[in-house]
A protein has these predicted regions:
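Structured, solvent-exposed acidic/aromatic patches
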Residues: 26-80, 84-347, 369-373
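Pocket-edge structural micro-motifs
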Residues: 9, 86, 253-255, 380, ...
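C-terminal functional modules
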Residues: 342-453
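A broad detector of the eukaryotic-type serine/threonine protein kinase catalytic domain
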Residues: 10, 63-66, 381
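Acidic, glycine-rich segments characteristic of secretory precursors and extracytoplasmic regions
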Residues: 1-25, 34, 45-46, 60, ...
Length: 453
């Protein structure tokens, strides 16, 4: 059961990054045909059903672990539950949570919980997972993410806590911590100040990154898509121009030079503007041979080249750097910022180029906190490439990078901020669906959820 849960949820995250997340945050751009999502015509995204399906299995893992007194499995189940629910609530807002998998209790139409309550529940579950996962809690059979190591899962639990707490940075709420009501800032600090009892990622060896094996079912999920469809996903002009400006070696990891430039030996990278119509995108810069696509070998041809990313060490360092600049914790922000960038380079097998940190826009502005935060968040955006929808979730909070709406969008020049609830909810769970709309607002991609209010 556990391998199927891990593989299924990670694959859903990867597939949604490919088809939607990479486009809306302008890592990639769509060309030639079916450019609707890049133009914000978001009729529906295949996110809800598969993730709730995985959650039903997660609940079984947790219940069996409790019955059999297997704390390591309960801890892993709580981590997976929190991560999957974080994807759902961050994408939709209020969603079924407390009654979401209670069919066995006779609840076939679960209520939609408020997003604030879901966040409190996720943070509580991750704290409980941290307590359950110990060196003595036992190995974890079927663990295709961390090969059965409970301490790796413990680090993931606490790293996810940092991610969720940072997402609450604009909310004036208090959280329960050991019976006391504390601020979001203090909750964050309680983790970073306790590496012995609440460890987080300390190297790329801790990355929550599913390694694919190169054969079904354990292969990169885009490997089985149609090759013609894959080639309609190009590097975005936004990402390409940013990486070229910084002479950033990750450009050749994320994408390929244009076919024409490979032929003539010049090896040029040309990104495509987001949201062009089918005809305009297909002919941009002279056509497909003069546009840079995704790295074909890494993200299509070799089924075990890329990894399914949940969270990385680089992200943890960026979270800490941002927290330092926000006066949440005391440490050196510049050191964390530079180490985060170096960790991202290392993650992709690249060395930090000489002089990289001396460039304007990369060199750390120690006397300008606002500019420092912008650079931290820009570099974090780069590092979150293909990490589910995390780049989009982070942009909604920070507005970084400062991107323009896609060119020929059909959403009145508004960048979407949520997914629509699936149409099936309107008929199968109508009363609870309507109650969520009454609280949150219309079922629109432009409706701001509680996190964004």
């Amino acid at each position: 059961m556990l391998p199927d849960i891990i593989r299924g949820s990670v694959n859903t995250s990867v597939n949604t990054a490919h088809t939607t997340g990479n486009l809306v945050l302008q890592y990639t751009a769509k060309v030639s045909f079916a450019t609707e999502i890049d133009r914000y015509n978001w009729a529906g995204v295949g996110y809800w059903q598969p993730l709730y399906g995985d959650l039903r299995n997660v609940e079984d893992v947790i219940q069996l672990a409790q019955e059999r007194d297997q704390p390591q499995y309960e801890g892993v189940g709580l981590v997976l539950k929190s991560w999957i629910f974080s994807m759902l609530t961050n994408a939709y807002g209020d969603v079924p949570y407390s009654e979401s998998v209670a069919v066995q209790e006779g609840i076939e139409t679960p209520k939609y919980d408020r997003q604030e309550a879901i966040y409190r529940g996720m943070l509580a579950d991750l704290r409980r997972a941290n307590e359950l996962l110990t060196p003595d809690s036992g190995s974890i059979q079927g663990d295709i993410l961390y090969n059965g190591d409970p301490m790796k899962w413990k680090k993931l639990a606490n790293s996810l806590r940092l991610r969720l707490l940072m997402r609450l940075s604009e909310k004036d709420i208090s959280l329960n911590l050991d019976g006391d009501e504390v601020s979001v800032r203090d909750a964050f600090q309680s983790i970073t100040s306790a590496p012995e009892t609440a460890p987080v990622f300390t190297s790329n060896d801790d990355n929550a990154a599913l390694e694919y094996l190169g054969s079904r079912p354990n292969e990169w999920p885009r490997h089985t898509s149609r090759i013609g469809t894959f080639r309609t996903f190009k590097l975005s002009k936004t990402l390409t121009d940013t990486l070229k400006h910084f002479d950033d070696p990750r450009l050749s990891v994320f994408g390929d030079p244009t076919a024409a430039s490979v032929e003539d030996g010049s090896r040029k990278f040309v990104g495509v503007p987001n949201g062009l119509t089918n005809d305009a995108s297909g002919s941009f810069n002279g056509g497909p041979d003069f546009q840079s696509g995704l790295n074909f070998t890494r993200y299509y041809d070799e089924p075990d080249a890329a990894k399914g990313l949940i969270m990385t060490y680089a992200e943890v360092l960026f979270l800490k750097a941002e927290a330092i600049e926000m006066d949440w914790i005391s440490a050196d922000a510049q050191t964390h910022y530079q180490e985060a960038i170096e960790a991202s380079f290392e993650q992709y097998g690249k060395s930090t180029p000489p002089g990289y940190f001396g460039q304007e826009g990369v060199s750390y502005p120690t006397s300008d906190s606002e500019q420092a935060l912008e650079q931290i968040r820009t570099q974090k955006w780069i590092a979150l490439f293909y990490t589910g929808l995390e780049g989009w979730f982070n942009w909604r909070r920070t507005g970084i990078p400062d991107i323009d709406p896609s060119v020929d969008n059909v959403n009145a020049d508004e960048i979407p901020v949520r997914f629509r609830y699936p149409e099936s909810e309107q008929s199968l769970n109508a009363d609870n669906y309507q109650a969520a709309l009454d609280r949150q607002g219309p079922n629109s991609i432009n409706t701001e959820m509680w996190l964004l209010e």
